[in-house]
Every structure is written in C-alpha cells, then in structure tokens.
Regions:
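Active-site anion/phosphate-binding pocket segments in diverse small-molecule metabolic enzymes
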Residues: 129-317
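Active-site-proximal beta-alpha core segment in soluble small-molecule metabolic enzymes
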Residues: 1-133, 141-142
Length: 317
C-alpha cells in the first residue's frame, strides 16, 4: 500500500504479526520491538529485519539463526535510562557493544531506550542528550557509525517541536498513530483522527431489575461490580442490559460508552451489565432493544487487546 511507503519499518511485539506483514508485503522492513526469547531466535530472524536487544545470550542465538539462514540481521541495543524496563546498564555499554561486535551476521545499527511505558518516566531533553552522548561515545571508541538512535515511543513526539537533539532520529510509534493523541499530555495531533476505532457489543438480555442483589453475598464471586451498586436505594428499579463481552475480552475500564446516560454495573468473564435507567426516549418509546448494539470508544490498551483476540470480529470501513 502506498500510504505505508514513507516509514522506516513496521514494528510488532508479536511474531505472528510480523509474519502476517511479511506475507502481505515482503518488501516492508519489519522490527521485533521487544527483547527476543531465545527459543524464538530462528523465527525472529525469519520475519524481522531488525530487533531490539539487552541480552548477549539472546543476540548470540540471533547470530546463530542468522548464519543458518544466510542473513545479515540488524539490531538496536537498548540502554536503561530510568524507566526500569528493558535496557542494559549504562556502565556496561562499551563491553556489551564490543562483545556483540564480534558476532557473525549481526549488524549493530543503533542505540535506543524505553521511557514512559511502565513507570511513566518522561523522555526529557536531558534523557535524549544522554542517549545522544552514548552514540557519540560508541562511534568514537569503535569508529563505527550508528544510523538509528531510537528515542522512545509516542510519548516522545510532543518534544520534537521543542528543544530536541537532532541525532535522535527513530521513534517506535503506536498509540499516537492509532488514537490520534499524545499519551504524554492527551492532546490531539492536528492531522490525526481520534475516532479511528469503535467497539460495539450486542444486548443479549434487557430487563427491569432491582438495583441491589438479593441474598447473602459471598467472597466466591468472580465478577467485578461498580461501587455505586452497594449504595443504591433498596427499592429502586431500573433497566439492566447484559452485553456479550466480559473481562476475558477487554477491561471495561478501558471502554467509554458513547451514550453518556448508561452506567457500568458489573462484569464477569464473558458478560457485562450496564444500567439504562428508564430505557425511554423523549417520546416514550424504548431506547434500547434486545439485539441492539451499544457502542464504545476504546482506549489504546482496549484496542490492543481486542485486535489481538481471534474471538472479536473486526470490520474495516
């Protein structure tokens, strides 16, 4: 597709995703964007042109697989800059690079870091300068050019228009492209849509029921309910709709109903209940019926889970 020709590569943390990309567009460069499990080294080399690494043992496995497949595999070494997710310790970089440099069929093309994904450490100018300095250190010490300095994910994008090191030239972008906003400040990007995804669930039961359950409540329940359920009037009733999704499919907290008048009541493994109030339109007609869809705006995490589920139907419009 022409619209994806001006990017460096397509990254995925799922090898099944990279395999599908190569089947559709063998010419597209692909990147495996998490450290490689050793047992999957052969598959990584087969379907990824690039991969990110923090383990010398894993890179040796990648090297052996690349030799066997007669391929030159490109890698980015990830450095720990405070997020405490993937990344080698900074003081070990020179020795690590030197060891990897000796491996056959491995080309070190860059350095990278992960920020903002677990603890939420911001990719500040100071952090990016540190990453740039490690590039300079490696290039001076080994007389080898590093083409890619991967400065993080979507959270880094708002900083580009501010003071930003020019040497940081690669970003692993997902959330901003798909959701149209920055995870750093929640602001919308001018040229991107914030409505690219919608999730809809079907009403499989619709009944007027009491607001609180009747009977002895034990600790054996496996569901999750709204705190407001326990504060409701003992005698009040309202219409409850059971929708055909549960916690196995997606976390309800990652879904925002497009109809602001409905409220979450509870969820179990495969069904979720919402309160519809009187379920009346201004003209007195029922607002919702059995079989009707209830529509939601999903968060990035909801989209990721739903798109990776083989049980969820996907429609591209």
């Amino acid at each position: 597709a022409p619209e994806i020709d001006k990017i460096h590569s397509i990254g995925d943390s799922r090898l099944s995703g990279l395999k599908k990309i190569k089947q559709i567009r063998p010419d597209i460069k692909t990147m495996y964007i998490k450290p490689t499990p050793i047992q999957f080294a052969k598959t990584v080399v087969e379907y990824a042109d690039f991969s990110v690494h923090t383990s010398f043992t894993a890179i040796k496995a990648i090297s052996a697989a690349a030799v066997a497949q007669k391929k030159q595999h490109k890698i980015i070494i990830m450095i720990e800059l405070g997020e405490l997710r993937e990344g080698i310790m900074r003081e070990n970089l020179i020795e690590f690079y030197n060891n990897v440099f000796e491996l056959p069929n491995i080309e070190i093309v860059g350095l990278g870091t992960n920020l903002g994904c677990m603890y939420g450490i911001e990719p500040t100018y100071d952090k990016m300068i540190q990453l740039s300095l490690y590039k300079q250190l490696i290039e001076a010490r080994f007389n080898k050019k590093l083409d890619l300095i991967s400065g993080g994910s979507s959270i880094t994008l708002p900083l580009i228009k501010k003071q930003f090191p020019k040497s940081v030239n690669h970003f692993r972008i997902g959330e901003s492209i798909f959701m149209g906003v920055s995870p750093l400040d929640g602001k919308k990007f001018e040229s991107l849509s914030i409505d690219a995804f919608e999730y809809s669930a079907t009403i499989i039961e619709l009944e007027e029921k009491e607001s609180i359950p009747d009977g002895v409540i034990s600790d054996a329940n496996v569901g999750h309910t709204s705190d407001e359920v326990h504060d409701a009037d003992d005698f009040s009733k309202s219409f409850k709709a059971i929708l055909d999704f549960g916690s196995i499919d997606v976390d309800h907290t990652e879904l925002i109903p497009k109809d602001k008048s409905i409220e979450f009541i509870g969820t179990t493994s495969d069904m979720t209940v919402y309160e519809l109030g009187t379920n009346k339109k201004p003209n007195g007609q029922p607002k919702y019926k059995i079989g009707q869809k209830v529509r939601f705006t999903p968060s990035y995490m909801a989209v990721a889970r739903l798109m990776n589920s083989k049980y969820i139907e996907k429609n591209i419009i």
